[in-house]
Amino acid sequence: LPPKLLPGGYVMGLSGYRHPDYGMQDGVNLIEIDYDGNIVWEFDNFENIDDPGRDHRWMARQPHNYQREGNPVGSYVPGMDAKPLSGNTLILVHQTIHNPKISDKKLLDDAMIEVDWDGNILWKWSISEHFDELGFDEAAKNVLFRDPNLRASDGGVGDYLHVNCMSYLGPN
């Protein structure tokens, strides 16, 4: 995922990824750096991870998109400047769950969280908690139950919907 340039020469992006044996596209932490390379903001406290043979640590588990408050698209738009030194951040994350209503297999569940400048999670919206609202008919639910797009990571996990993007809504 490419980093995003913010006003004033600030850059936001991932500092690295979790080992692929244990996670699929799990960003370790989302950081913002200034022009001189100093970290001015960091988020990594979504999930506490203890992978075998690795250091126990907190991770963002951020696979794809993120948006800083003020700019819903992530690139320059006149009058919609992201807030480089303040504001909330919307982050697409995922976590490993067991939900027998969706599948009898382990699942990689996508979610959206909003984090304040201090790294506090203000709210979370998880796909698995709203699965019945997505409008899948019984045939589609049956397919997802039997094969939720299994991946080798994490001992076999179903990447059942694989969300890539989310965004703040701009002015209507």
Residue ranges and their predicted role:
Residues 1-172:
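Histidine-/acidic-rich catalytic cores in large beta-rich domains
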